């Protein structure tokens, strides 16, 4: 009997296990699926950045969705998947119902297979489950494998982020926009409202949230928050690009002591439980700005906190970028804790009266110097760290890279209005001298030399380097206003902030101190003191160039949106101020060959030029096409400037884009240009301009194709033609009239 009981017990175990499995299968809830819209977004952003997808959408044409659905957030993502065969419109129609419906196993398998045949097997799709919803949990596991195939650069990545605000709790917040500890992000298709004041682990790419991986809870620390106002019940703070009121967990009576300070806020379920104010402040001239530190006069290099803030507190409080900290500025205060800068506070606008110039080496070939030698007829104040020394007149300061002299920035300030002469430099004028002060810093690449100088003094050494002093005064005054405006705008770009400079002294910005100052050019600067060009109240980017071909062009030559600089227009240099347009290549070729086309700068040698070249010369600059068989301009920009050049060869063809690249491809140091006046000019490795036409003239005895290139003008062709301005001044036009001719809709005002 016992034996049979044991047998029944053993046989019963499998039955019990099978019964439990059946119960689990019957009663376990189905895993939630992922919508096709959400899946499409994740796939599209694995393949393209949001910017690339936006560009693709503009060229794509008509959407596959109905007109009343085109505005839905998911349309571009799904359109991209349909267009690239990740989804089949015959099986998955392009409509709202299917977009918001769940992705199926079959569809997930198709997407995986399109990326890699090996990925399809991970989906586990079969005939029985093919039309069932593919679980969201499984999709995100699969997504990790998809990223290894589609996003090998790791553009889609995981971040920890705190959500400060969404359209639900912030009035005026744009749809699908979240203010976060990572800045302003978009979250198309996600639901984030319930995550305000939560810390999340998320997947994102270039500012677009893709998926919330984990909610880390509501016990968070908001670091480096600016306190605007408050009362016993809560604080009004500036956090994540927004102003927001946050309540206290318990009433706090000393709120007035917190206002106008930076603090860390300890949060619990959306309420403040602790305020840690950071009161230590330092200030000093900004000498350089690095990725992880700021160099301050009197303090040296101070590291940045990992969650540092840059805040403009005058007017409306606004968060800025590290690049907005202007080197040379003395209007910044820095809030420090534990030896690190937690915030840079800008309490007033930066003055425009000084500029910091990186002095290039000989020949303007490098920003670094191996050796620098400086003398001065007067005494010099030498500053390094917290040490100050007065040097006698005629002292020689000699520094060699790597000698340890300038591992900390060396500042030299001439006394009694003297200038510092850099004996180790050679310019067109000889050995240059500099007003203001000079700074030397040794870097791993060599010595860096920076000149800080008054803006007007800087301009007096720019104008003679950019325009001959023999030119008409009104042309020189127009140049002075242009140069001042250009210098102001470029100085705000902080291009060399890591070295402590804003611009350099080469043609990349404006040539500075290459030619001796002149009384006439200095007078042009003085008579236009402080005057700049404005459009809608903002200083313009006052581009200028040497000589036109009879017409200018606009900023489209640099792939910029012309609408962003409406004052830069394509126009002819004639009294009518009309726009020249060319219906065909033949029309432009006819124009550029005309030496007698009337224009204000038609008398200058580079108004027209031409030269002979060959397939061999062009092939030396254009690789991968074999023996050259043909060259032609296939696209022109406003005014006829060449934008695309098709080069055909025995082994293929290539298209060169951009006027500068075309000038380089067709140029060569061996070329001899015949100019407007019949004289010749050699050494043009970069052609004078992109206003050109090219004609095939036959082949030589070796079968090499020969060409003649006809061109006109010198420079990029955007903004003011300097020789055009001279022609206008000779015709009796004043400097304001000249400037308003070249820059449409501008006003000329004195900078406050």
Q: Can you say where each PLM-predicted feature lies in the sequence?
A:
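Conserved, structurally critical residues in compact or repeat modules of secreted/surface
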Residues: 39-43, 81, 103-104, 108-112, ...
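Conserved, single-site charged/polar hotspot
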Residues: 2-31, 37, 48-50, 54, ...
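Extracellular interaction modules
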Residues: 75, 102, 131-141, 195, ...
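Active-site-adjacent "gating/activation" loops or surface patches in catalytic cores
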Residues: 71
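Short linear loop/turn motifs
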Residues: 92-104, 743-744
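Aromatic- and histidine-enriched alpha-helix N-cap/loop-to-helix transition segments
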Residues: 31-38, 100-107, 131-138
């Amino acid at each position: 009997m016992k034996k049979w009981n044991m047998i029944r017990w053993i046989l019963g175990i499998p039955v019990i296990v099978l019964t439990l499995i059946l119960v689990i299968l019957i009663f376990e809830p189905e895993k939630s699926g992922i919508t096709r819209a959400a899946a499409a977004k994740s796939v599209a952003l694995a393949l393209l950045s949001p910017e690339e997808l936006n560009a693709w959408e503009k060229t794509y044409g008509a959407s596959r969705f109905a007109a009343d659905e085109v505005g839905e957030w998911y349309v571009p993502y799904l359109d991209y998947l349909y267009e690239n065969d990740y989804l089949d419109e015959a099986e998955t129609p392009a409509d709202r119902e299917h977009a918001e419906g769940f992705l199926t196993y079959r569809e997930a398998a198709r997407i995986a297979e399109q990326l890699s045949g090996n990925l399809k097997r991970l989906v586990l799709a079969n005939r029985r489950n093919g039309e069932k919803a593919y679980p969201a949990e499984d999709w995100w596991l699969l997504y990790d494998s998809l990223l290894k195939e589609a996003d090998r650069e790791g553009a889609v990545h995981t971040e920890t982020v705190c959500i400060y605000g969404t359209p639900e709790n912030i009035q005026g917040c744009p749809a699908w926009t979240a203010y976060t500890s990572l800045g302003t992000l978009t979250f198309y298709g996600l639901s984030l409202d319930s995550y305000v004041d939560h810390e999340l682990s998320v997947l994102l790419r270039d500012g677009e949230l893709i998926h919330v991986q984990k909610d880390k809870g509501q016990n968070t620390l908001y670091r480096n928050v600016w306190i605007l106002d408050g009362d016993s019940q809560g604080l009004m703070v500036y956090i994540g690009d927004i102003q927001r009121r946050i309540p206290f967990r318990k009433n706090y009576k000393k709120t007035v002591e917190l206002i106008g300070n930076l603090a860390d806020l300890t949060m619990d379920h959306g309420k403040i439980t602790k305020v840690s104010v950071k009161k230590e402040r330092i200030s000093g001239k900004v000498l350089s700005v690095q990725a992880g530190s700021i160099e301050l006069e009197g303090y040296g290099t101070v590291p940045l906190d990992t969650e540092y803030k840059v805040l403009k507190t005058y007017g409306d409080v606004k968060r800025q970028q590290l690049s907005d900290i202007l080197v040379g500025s003395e209007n910044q205060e820095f809030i420090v804790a534990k030896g690190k800068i937690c915030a840079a506070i800008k309490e007033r606008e930066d003055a425009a009266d000084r500029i910091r110039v990186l002095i290039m080496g000989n020949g303007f070939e490098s920003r670094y110097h191996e050796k620098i030698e400086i003398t001065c007829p007067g005494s010099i104040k030498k500053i390094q760290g917290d040490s100050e020394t007065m040097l006698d007149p005629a002292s020689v300061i000699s520094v060699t890279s790597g000698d340890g002299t300038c591992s900390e920035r060396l500042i030299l300030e001439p006394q009694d209005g003297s200038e510092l002469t850099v004996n180790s430099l050679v310019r067109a004028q000889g050995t240059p001298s500099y007003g203001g002060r000079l700074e030397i810093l040794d870097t791993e690449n060599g010595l860096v030399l920076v000149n800080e100088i008054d803006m007007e003094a800087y301009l007096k050494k720019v104008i003679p380097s950019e325009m001959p002093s023999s030119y008409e005064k009104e042309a020189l005054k127009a140049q002075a206003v242009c140069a001042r405006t250009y210098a102001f705008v470029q100085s705000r770009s902080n291009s060399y902030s890591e070295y402590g400079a804003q611009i350099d002294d080469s043609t990349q910005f404006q040539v500075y101190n290459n030619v001796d100052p002149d009384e006439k050019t200095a007078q042009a600067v003085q008579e236009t003191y402080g005057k700049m060009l404005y459009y809608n109240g903002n200083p313009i980017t006052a581009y200028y160039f040497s000589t036109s071909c009879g017409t200018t062009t606009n900023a489209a030559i640099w792939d910029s949106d012309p609408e962003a600089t409406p004052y830069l227009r394509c126009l002819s240099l004639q009294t009518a101020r009309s726009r020249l347009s060319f219906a065909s290549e033949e029309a432009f070729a006819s124009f550029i060959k005309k030496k007698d086309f009337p224009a204000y700068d038609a008398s200058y040698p580079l108004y027209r030029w031409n030269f002979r070249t060959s397939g061999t010369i062009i092939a030396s600059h254009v690789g991968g096409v074999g023996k050259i068989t043909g060259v032609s301009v296939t696209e022109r920009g406003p005014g006829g400037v060449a934008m695309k050049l098709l080069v055909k060869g025995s082994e293929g063809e290539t298209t060169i884009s951009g006027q500068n690249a075309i000038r380089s491809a067709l140029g060569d140091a061996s070329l001899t240009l015949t100019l407007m006046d019949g004289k010749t000019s050699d050494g043009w490795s970069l052609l004078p301009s992109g206003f050109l036409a090219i004609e095939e003239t036959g082949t030589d005895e070796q079968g090499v194709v020969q060409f003649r290139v006809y061109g006109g003008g010198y420079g990029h062709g955007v903004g003011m033609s300097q020789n055009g301005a001279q022609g206008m001044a000779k015709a009796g036009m004043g400097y304001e009239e000249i400037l308003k001719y070249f820059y449409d809709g501008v006003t000329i005002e004195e900078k406050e």
